Amino acid sequence: RIAYLLYAQKGKISSKDILIISPNKVFADYISNVLPELGETTVPETSMEQILSTVLDNKYKFQNFFGQVSELLEKPAPDFIERIQYKASFEFVSRLDKFILHMENHYFRATDVKLTKYITIPAEFVGEQFKRFHRYPIRQRFETMADYILEMMKIQYNLTVTTAEKNLLRKEIKNMFSGNNDLQIYKDFFEWAGKPEMFKMRKNRMLEYADMAPLAYLHLALDGNKTQTHIRHLLIDEMQDYSPIQYKVIQKLYPCRKTILGDASQSVNPYGSSTAAMIQKAFTTGEVMKLCKSYRSTFEITSLAQKIQANNELEPIMRHGEQPEILPFKNAEEE
């Protein structure tokens, strides 16, 4: 797909304009062997963990994806599974969006601000400016509000404001908002949703992997999108291993065209995975294409796989090989 894009749009798009999101480097290493033939350098690659950590300014320690998978395999606690399932649901995304609106209406408490010895800015006027700039993300409003209020003071009182007074006003306005700590408002969300048990901090203040995307989503909603406009095409590998809330974060960061590849039956995390239909719902637009012809395996291997998990749409190619053997073992050591 990348080779096709570079060939078909030569001169319009180059390898540096494309980004791969992949859980491992095998995919990118394979691609890097193909691209030199097209006169291109390696395509930049990142992971979901890197993206989420960067959005959150690398503030938090967190369990990575493979740590989550390992825990599910070795000690799958029911409450851990329940937390993953809840945060991978569309209901969860909907509740987060409603909570962001709740913060808009309840987390800002305007108060009087004594700007100078003789001038006090009334709380009502401050509150009006918070609503005036409602198109801005909440945390982006504070500086704009302060500048506007000072401009009004200058017009009304012919006032020359010092830098110290300007900084004081910005600080006062920021402190009127009780959602300046991302982690605290994330905890508030679960209390507000009536599901406090759905958030659990691990030892050494480590976050679970499933908490990184919703925390990043809240951060982007309050701080504004850090849109990556230099990326012109995004390619996501192993699509089945990402949840709807992760795709919502991706959509905020990368508004470009995307190619999303994967196989829903190959998910290594059945509790937080996505099907093609779920991904289409998360993005609201896009075309789903199913590639049903299997070139990877012989007819015999594909037939065995069909006995384990049937897929009526799969079309094996008539390339024959040895019949796979099933070898029984009595214990793990023997195996």
Spans of features found by a protein language model:
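Walker A/P-loop NTP-binding motif
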Residues: 1-11
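Conserved helicase motor core of SF1/SF2 NTP-dependent helicases
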Residues: 11, 16, 25-53, 57-67, ...
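Short, flexible loop segments at the rims of nucleotide/cofactor-binding pockets, characterized by
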Residues: 79-85, 211-213, 235-239, 326-329
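Conserved helicase NTPase catalytic core signature
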Residues: 86-87, 91-97, 101-233, 243-247
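Charged, amphipathic alpha-helical linkers/stalks
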Residues: 52-108
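Conserved SAM-binding loop
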Residues: 20
